[in-house]
């Protein structure tokens, strides 16, 4: 009678500090009454200790109660460890069980052990346990066999997984769910749907789990029609109010760009889980609709659901995509007001948002308060500086990251190498290459492409070619980099040869490849070849030229003095006829060839279309200056002064002692600026006097 009361008390306990105190009292009472041999009480005590996360006390019960001859207790301990992802402990207990002379594993033992081997990736030992299961005669047990299916899926041994499943003499809905879920979780969404179809055709009725996984597979594959078909089955079989099924439907319709249907399903949900709210928000994130995301967040808070870090990160992503600073600041304010302990991903999302909205100072403030012992926070700063063209700061942040002892990863290296490419900072690039080698990442294809780009743009063609040859599977990007490298360093014929070789390997060039080819023609003055490739873009390669391609052609023709041909190309489309970049390129060619008539016409077009652009007035000034029309040139300068327009100062840089030092024209921010300018004046004097 006392035993039943104690068991009833243990079953009432939940995961709380108060419950833990009660459990300890019951535990003490069990010992006082001498009930150490009561198997049911012992099992219940182990289970409630695991529920309260008191693993040590659970182990203490196992070690000190006199009932280890019963496999029931061994299974309870292993199950507790397995449910809490303490897989090493699970296997340690199993090893002791195998060495126990008075107890042997049963069908309830193996699922926990199999799960542990799968989670730890112990393929060899997993196969051994499979053999032991067969020898023990439990391979026909539905739960044990389902566990083996899951284990092989974790090892990515899908054929073995299916073989075990197909050999099962008896299956139930749970075993079908196991195999379907395993394939879905391992990235095999198509196979998961195929198995779902087999399950139905075998006469098994899908339950909530089956339908949720099948809908999630449709979501991953963006297979809207199949998703709608499963939705109809959900309604027909009475699952239209199921929380998990509806959350999956909201996610599927959102990803398939059917937001109205997603919203309709969402509105009908009697109880909206956090997963459902997040799924609805993610649908609007994909469209960059930050306004709708913020509206859903407000409604979510009103209805009593606390946003998670995933919720906030998703909304910030929408704000970044739409460049909506106001909504982004609202989310940032919510994080501060709610005393939300923002994780690394929320802060990284804020940094990305502020950079995209042109608020670098705010991004730097967030970074200063962000966790800095992981690579993610540094990576977002480096990539953000790259995105706004501040190569110097990107390299500077990388140096800071290394100096504080944070180990760069693949993302770090692929982010910082383009900065070295743009700055032609070869020595810095070599230093980073050495770090990549030390990190044993030199075989990573993304890094090989980034290194190839860096060496080619820094003029080290020999090393670029070595890396190019080391890439096992050359894609369009790697070929394009080599074409660009040869073209920009005085070897246009080699560039065109590489272009032909690329096509022989069956690779179709893209717009960037053709841009590299046109650039190579431009550097070498290969006018006719350039015109041929430009005309073939649509007809042969099916590529629509963009502004950069037009700019290349204008430059090629402009250098050759074929200015009217260049002007005719600009006039071909409305998009190109008034484009500032194209007109400026042609205008520079007019200045070079002293073609004042066409140059004056283009300059007036630029001033008319871009009246607030200082560079427009500078090109006009240069035209008048080249023709010695000094009065007209002075009027342009006066106009610029009246409008408050200033030419952007020129920028130069130099590598010194593994550092990239940069400086601007008329820059006086350096502490020793006066000494620098005195030295420059002295050098200029010597040069003018011929000394």
Curated annotation (Swiss-Prot):
Q: Gene3D superfamilies from the entry?
A: Tetratricopeptide repeat domain (1.25.40.10)
Q: Where is this region: Type E motif?
A: 582-657
| Start and end residues of each stretch annotated as Type E(+) motif | 658-688
Q: Does the keyword Nucleotide-binding apply?
A: no
Q: Does the keyword Electron transport apply?
A: no
Which InterPro entries does the protein's record reference? E_motif, Pentatricopeptide_rpt, PPR_At4g14850-like_plant, TPR-like_helical_dom_sf
Q: Which UniProt keywords apply?
A: Repeat
Q: Which GO terms describe its biological process?
A: RNA modification
What is an example of a GO molecular function annotated in this UniProt entry?
Answer: RNA binding
Stretches forming PPR repeats: 38-68, 70-104, 106-140, 141-171, 172-206, 207-241, 242-272, 273-307, 308-342, 343-373, 374-408, 409-443, 444-474, 475-509, 510-540, 546-576
Transmembrane regions: none
| NCBIfam families in the record | PPR
The family line of this record is:
Belongs to the PPR family. PCMP-E subfamily.
List the protein's name: Pentatricopeptide repeat-containing protein At5g27110
Q: Which gene encodes it?
A: PCMP-E14
């Amino acid at each position: 009678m006392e035993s039943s009361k104690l068991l009833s008390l243990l079953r009432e306990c939940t995961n709380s500090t108060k419950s833990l105190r009660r459990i300890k009292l019951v535990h003490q009472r069990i010992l006082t009454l001498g009930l150490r041999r009561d198997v049911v009480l012992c099992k219940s005590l182990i289970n409630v200790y695991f529920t309260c996360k008191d693993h040590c006390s659970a182990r203490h019960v196992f070690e000190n109660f006199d009932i280890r001859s019963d496999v029931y207790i061994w299974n309870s301990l292993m199950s507790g460890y397995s449910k809490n992802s303490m897989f090493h402990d699970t296997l340690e207990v199993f090893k002791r069980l195998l060495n126990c002379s008075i107890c042997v594993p049963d069908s309830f033992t193996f699922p926990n052990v199999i799960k542990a081997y799968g989670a730890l990736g112990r393929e060899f030992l997993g196969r051994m346990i499979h053999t032991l299961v067969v020898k023990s005669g439990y391979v026909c047990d539905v739960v044990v066999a389902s566990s083996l299916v899951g284990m092989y899926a974790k090892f990515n041994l899908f054929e073995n997984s299916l073989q075990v499943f197909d050999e099962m003499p008896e299956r139930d809905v749970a075993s079908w769910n196991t195999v379907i879920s395993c394939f879905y979780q391992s990235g095999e969404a198509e196979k998961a749907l195929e198995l779902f179809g087999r399950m139905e055709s075998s006469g098994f009725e899908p339950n909530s789990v089956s339908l949720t996984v099948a809908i999630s597979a449709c979501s991953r594959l963006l297979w809207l029609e199949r998703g709608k078909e499963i939705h109809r089955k959900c309604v027909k079989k009475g699952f239209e109010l199921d929380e998990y099924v509806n959350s999956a439907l909201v996610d599927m319709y959102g990803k398939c760009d059917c937001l109205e249907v997603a919203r309709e399903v969402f509105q009908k949900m009697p109880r909206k889980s956090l997963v459902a709210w997040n799924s609805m928000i993610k649908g609007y994130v994909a469209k960059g609709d930050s306004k709708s995301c913020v509206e859903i967040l407000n409604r979510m808070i009103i209805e009593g659901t606390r946003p998670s870090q995933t919720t906030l990160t998703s909304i910030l992503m929408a704000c970044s995509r739409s460049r909506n600073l106001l909504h982004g600041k609202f989310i940032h304010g919510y994080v501060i007001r709610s005393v939300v302990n923002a994780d690394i991903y929320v802060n990284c999302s804020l940094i990305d948002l502020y950079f995209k909205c042109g608020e670098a100072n705010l991004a730097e403030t967030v970074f200063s308060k962000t966790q800095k012992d992981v690579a993610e926070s540094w990576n977002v700063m480096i990539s953000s500086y790259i995105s706004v063209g501040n190569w110097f700061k990107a390299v500077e942040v990388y140096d800071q990251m290394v100096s504080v002892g944070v180990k760069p990863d693949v993302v770090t290296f692929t982010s910082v190498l383009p900065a070295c490419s743009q700055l032609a900072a070869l020595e810095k690039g070599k230093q980073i290459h050495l770090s990549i080698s030390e990190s044993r990442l030199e075989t990573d294809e993304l890094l090989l492409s980034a290194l190839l780009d860096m060496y080619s743009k820094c003029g080290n063609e020999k090393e670029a070619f070595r890396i190019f040859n080391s890439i096992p599977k050359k894609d369009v990007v790697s070929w394009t980099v080599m074409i660009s490298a040869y073209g920009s360093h005085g070897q246009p014929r080699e560039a065109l040869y590489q272009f032909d070789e690329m096509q022989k390997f069956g690779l179709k060039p893209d717009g960037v490849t053709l841009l590299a080819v046109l650039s190579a023609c431009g550097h070498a003055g290969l006018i006719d070849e350039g015109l041929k490739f430009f005309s073939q873009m649509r007809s042969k390669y099916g590529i629509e030229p963009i502004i950069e391609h037009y700019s290349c052609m204008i430059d090629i023709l402009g250098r050759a003095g074929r200015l009217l041909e260049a002007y005719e190309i600009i006039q071909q489309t409305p998009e190109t006829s008034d484009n500032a970049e194209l007109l400026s390129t042609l205008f520079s060619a007019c200045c070079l060839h002293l073609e004042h008539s066409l140059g004056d016409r283009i300059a007036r077009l630029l001033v008319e279309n871009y009246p607030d652009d200082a560079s427009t007035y500078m090109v006009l000034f240069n035209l008048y200056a080249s023709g010695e029309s000094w009065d007209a040139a002075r009027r342009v300068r006066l106009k610029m002064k009246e409008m408050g327009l200033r030419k952007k100062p020129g920028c130069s840089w130099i590598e010194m002692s593994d550092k990239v030092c940069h400086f601007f024209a008329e820059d006086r921010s350096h502490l020793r600026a006066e000494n620098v300018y005195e030295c420059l004046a002295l050098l200029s004097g010597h040069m003018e006097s011929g000394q």
